[in-house]
């Protein structure tokens, strides 16, 4: 017992970014050993699952960024406040409008697990702002690190436009050099004044962020599985609306290209195993976190 306290103190003297990496190592290894981590690279992902995940991300980032704005002048968060470079809400809004149409807010689902994640973010922002950095770091640097790779895979797998529609989430226009920006972010985060007890709480909150993500994935999987048990694929209202619009304009040149793209997407959904498709869709989000934490 006499040697444990000095060792613990020495450990807590490490940079916060390194402590976060070590604290989340186990959950990272678990993610690495799941089937989707390898299969994802094959680009086997369907449009519908991708849309569901994007919708949940919108609710999560809306809550996260609301609390960041609340605490932007608070010394426990202000040094890592980079809204122009990192914030994702506006980008997700663009993606959702592309996928669901102008009425997307009425179309997207918010599962109970997603709402639980949202509620935790609000509790942290309002009552424990010193823990907000745990959520920001695991999300933003993960998205930034893995974003470009995932963008290319999604673009090819879903046959999305080369101009980037539907992929705004993965595009960080405010970051010209990702490596240098991550170095800046880590240095700012490591400079946050934080005692040992607070550091421990931040590390626990980072692990909790991973668990909340997993719960969201499980909830979305149940949503899809329930539909499959009923013997039909989930049909979002927006997809039905798109078909109706396309039918009324089927003779236009633009409609021809859109019809061809839609057909390819539907073929992709039919030829890929439902289980594999879902695991891969979850991989988009889990991979961004894992890559972000362990590729720096």
Curated annotation (Swiss-Prot):
Optimum pH is 7.4. GO terms for biological process: heme catabolic process; heme oxidation; negative regulation of ferroptosis; response to oxidative stress. The chain crosses the membrane at residues 274-296. Its EC number is 1.14.14.18. Keywords: Endoplasmic reticulum, Heme, Iron, Membrane, Metal-binding, Oxidoreductase, Transmembrane, Transmembrane helix. Residues 238-250 have a biased composition (Basic and acidic residues). The keyword Flavoprotein does not apply. Residues 231-264 are annotated as: Disordered. It catalyses: heme b + 3 reduced [NADPH--hemoprotein reductase] + 3 O2 = biliverdin IXalpha + CO + Fe(2+) + 3 oxidized [NADPH--hemoprotein reductase] + 3 H2O + H(+). Heme b binds at residues 21, 28, 137, 186. It is a single-pass type IV membrane protein. It holds the Pfam family Heme_oxygenase. Inhibited by metalloporphyrins in the following order of decreasing potency: tin mesoporphyrin > tin protoporphyrin > zinc protoporphyrin > manganese protoporphyrin > cobalt protoporphyrin. It is found in: Endoplasmic reticulum membrane. GO terms for molecular function: heme binding; heme oxygenase (decyclizing) activity; metal ion binding. The record marks 143 as: Important for catalytic activity. InterPro entries: Haem_Oase (IPR002051), Haem_Oase-like (IPR016053), Haem_Oase-like_multi-hlx (IPR016084), Haem_oxygenase_CS (IPR018207). The keyword Iron applies. One of its GO terms (cellular component) is endoplasmic reticulum membrane. The transmembrane domain is necessary for its oligomerization. PANTHER family: HEME OXYGENASE, HEME OXYGENASE 1. Homodimer and higher order homooligomer. Oligomerization is crucial for its stability and function in the endoplasmic reticulum. Belongs to the heme oxygenase family. This is Heme oxygenase 1.
């Amino acid at each position: 017992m006499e040697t444990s306290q000095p060792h613990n103190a020495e450990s807590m003297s490490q940079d916060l970014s390194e402590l976060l990496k070590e604290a989340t190592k186990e959950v990272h290894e678990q993610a690495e050993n799941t089937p989707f981590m390898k299969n994802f690279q094959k680009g086997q992902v369907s449009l519908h699952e991708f849309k569901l995940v994007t919708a949940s991300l919108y609710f999560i980032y809306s809550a996260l960024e609301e609390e960041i704005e609340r605490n932007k002048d608070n010394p426990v968060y202000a040094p890592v406040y980079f809204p122009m470079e990192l914030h994702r809400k506006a980008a997700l809004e663009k993606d959702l409008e592309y996928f669901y149409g102008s009425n997307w807010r009425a179309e997207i689902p918010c599962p109970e697990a997603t709402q639980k994640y949202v509620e935790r973010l609000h509790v942290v922002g309002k009552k424990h702002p010193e823990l907000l950095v745990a959520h920001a770091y695991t999300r933003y640097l993960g998205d930034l690190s893995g974003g470009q790779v995932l963008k290319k895979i999604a673009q090819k797998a879903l046959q999305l436009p080369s101009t980037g529609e539907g992929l705004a989430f993965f595009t960080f226009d405010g970051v010209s050099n990702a490596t240098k920006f991550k170095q800046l972010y880590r240095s700012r985060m490591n400079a946050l004044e934080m005692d040992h007890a607070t550091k421990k709480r931040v590390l626990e909150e980072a692990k909790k962020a991973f668990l909340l993500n997993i719960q969201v994935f499980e909830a979305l999987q149940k949503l899809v599985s329930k539909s499959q048990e009923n013997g039909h694929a989930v049909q979002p209202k927006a997809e039905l609306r798109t078909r109706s619009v396309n039918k009324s304009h089927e003779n236009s040149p633009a409609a021809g290209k859109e019809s061809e793209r839609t057909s390819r997407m539907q073929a992709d959904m039919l030829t890929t195993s439902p289980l594999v498709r879902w695991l891969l869709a979850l991989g988009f989000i889990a991979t961004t976190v894992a890559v972000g934490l362990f590729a720096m």
